[in-house]
């Protein structure tokens, strides 16, 4: 499996990472068996997935706690570990982010908050350093939280050896440039799938110009691109899938038809549609990292199968043409 450089950090890892939002549980995902989640993380690493991504907000610290438990059973040097900062519920700030499981969560990108976040995350994760630290959401008011001070705090943590690389999520092209102006930005994390390609217009060209890597989350479009969703599949009231444009009837029909047209390729590569989609997503953008969630060892094992798919050039061109035709 080929390793890909994370920006200019000097860290290199295979393209596929494990996202741990779901194992945090909470109202969004429901209860999980933590012992099963720990085994899922162990399985992911055993199968070649080396990047484990988490965040304090996932389950209000619970995801980090579960990842920390899993790390007790994994060689830390084999894992690239990322978490996030900038969302706060220890105290109020002028910027309300949202209410999560009945708790008011605020944005706080001050130096003090970032440093506190990192110290708390290191404790929960049971490690002495983070490989990547992302700012989870950006401030809507740079007068309140100057970006220069945010980046300065992260660079200080890097100098101290507490983080190895700096990342940012939910950004604009201008914000990427400003991060690079004030320090070294190595990677951004954004939503990207075969059906959601907005970042191709501005973010990807900016990242390519500045040597910033991209990590895509939700590559399977909330399950739509697994091949298991039909036109008759329904979701309970309040599910975010009901408001996702990709799940609306016309768009859903296009996606299902596209996937049905790739059945011969699943036979050729001895893989599932989900694995095929993950492999293609990684081919859509040179150097792209892809995050996939898993709550069970079997799901982690299945995701890792995408690492071993080597798409023929002609097949990749055919599939990209199909994707472009419905974009």
Regions found by a protein language model. Give the residues of each.
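Active-site groove signature of glycoside hydrolases
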Residues: 122-141
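N-terminal binding-site loop/beta-alpha segment at the start of enzyme catalytic domains
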Residues: 1-80
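Beta/alpha (TIM)-barrel catalytic core signal, keyed to glycine-rich beta->alpha loops juxtaposed to Asp/Glu
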Residues: 3, 138-327
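Structural preference for beta-strand elements that scaffold enzyme active sites
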Residues: 13-17, 50-51, 78-82, 129-132, ...
